[in-house]
Design a protein with these regions (language model features):
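Secretory pathway export signals and precursors
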Residues: 11-12, 31, 56, 203
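Compositionally biased amphipathic helical and low-complexity segments enriched in hydrophobic
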Residues: 19, 23-27, 45, 52
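Flexible coil/turn and secondary-structure edge motifs
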Residues: 42-223
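N-terminal, intrinsically disordered charge-dense segments
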Residues: 5, 26-42
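Short glycine-rich, low-complexity segments
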Residues: 5-7, 18
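Intrinsically disordered, low-complexity segments enriched in serine/threonine/proline/glycine
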Residues: 10, 20-21, 29, 40
Length: 223
């Protein structure tokens, strides 16, 4: 189930935030069949065609969620688990490595204010995508780098952005990007205490070992 009291992490200044009246309604149509399950989507009502979902795995989801919710144009964020075999896994089960899930941030964004490529640019530079199944001292398949796309358009943009970032990483002596780019499976909300963890604990753990290499500005012109 969605975390209790789930609210927009970064509501836009003019509209777009979830209203209390709409909370709890079940969505009849979602952006793509590959989006989160309708049960979970009941708490993330898509209020216009300009709102979309994106899913990213960058290691520990605490710090990643904070980076995304601070971006102007994101209207909701939540953390959870994707890409595993067990239904509705617990944090302990995911951390055991036995379920195959990755820690993931779900980002709802207003495409009239921020693009999917903007989110990808933040994704690539907030972690080290060349380290397989680890970020800094966090080691395990749950910390793998991953993009779960919700449409063919997202898939194409993600693949092109990977190529663009790989080119600049290679020039700077880094190895091959290990990020998996896959269709979005079901998203399982993480436990309540994980949601916006660093808002509740500003000095909490935020382990992201970045490459320090900026995403190439010219890549936006090509994609």
């Amino acid at each position: 189930m969605p975390p209790a009291g789930f609210e927009p992490a970064h509501p836009p200044p003019e509209g777009g935030a979830l209203s209390p009246e709409l909370r709890g309604q079940l969505i009849d149509q979602v952006i793509s069949p590959m989006c989160a399950s309708r049960t979970h989507m009941a708490e993330l009502v898509i209020m216009s065609q300009s709102l979309n979902l994106a899913y990213f795995g960058t290691g520990c989801f605490w710090g990643a969620e904070r980076r995304f919710w601070k971006m102007a144009g994101t209207t909701n964020t939540a953390v959870g688990y994707m890409g595993g075999l067990r239904e509705n896994p617990t944090y302990e089960q995911v951390c055991s490595g036995a379920t195959g899930h990755a820690e993931v941030v779900m980002v709802e964004f207003d495409s009239s204010r921020i693009t999917y490529l903007d989110l990808l640019r933040e994704f690539w530079t907030m972690h080290d995508p060349t380290t397989l199944n680890r970020q800094g001292g966090d080691i395990g398949t749950q910390y793998r780098s991953a993009i779960f796309y919700t449409s063919d358009e997202q898939k194409e943009i993600a693949l092109q952005s990977l190529s663009a970032y790989q080119e600049v990483l290679t020039k700077n002596g880094f190895s091959k990007i290990t990020t998996e780019i896959l269709p979005a499976p079901q998203f399982w909300f993480a436990e309540e205490y994980h949601q916006r963890y660093l808002e509740k604990n500003p000095n909490g753990y935020d382990c992201h070992s970045t490459t320090g290499i900026a995403y190439p500005e010219t890549a936006h012109e090509k994609i």
